[in-house]
């Protein structure tokens, strides 16, 4: 019991002395995770849509070649960034680009570098989620859209993506929560997120475990709040549970009528 009391006292001491640094780290973590998830979603949507562009043997050879090449590039991108740790991706992007370009390509803004790294990583995961969400939609809806003259882009924007987004919304939320935690590796490039502040504070006073406990409580609080908000968003997207079923055969009731914007429902003769 004395150890827990001592731990609590050390945590209070650390928080009272370094709370400004802790809060700054929390803000940087939330900002990076939110923006990276947002950009990663756009990357994933783009890759998912491009990866599902249909083609047949009747299409021109250049079109088939370009689409196959595009799918290969997307597949390599997804496999590389899903199959390697983000900390190594950070090293290769932040330190590797200046190394191979003789400092012609280097980052003057650490936040921009961190944002690029996390966004690209998130985009690789979202690309597969979007592809799965698109495939999960009934193919008959795509065929129906084509039957009325819609292009692939129009079909995606107006028919498929509104439904696919609802299906992948939980995955978007999961990626945000993962990013809140995984941004802790950005200390490797010098970005001062929540965990980087912990490393600095520990280096000053050597109170490692009390500071780590503050970090754990902080990350847990951030992820729990994010999970709660995401559940509320999903409920709002589901709509109201209270509704009334239409009585009778609506097709029979509407047969031979049309809806006029000024006169209401009129009979057709």
Label every model-predicted segment.
Residues 1-268:
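Transmembrane alpha-helices and adjacent helix-loop boundaries
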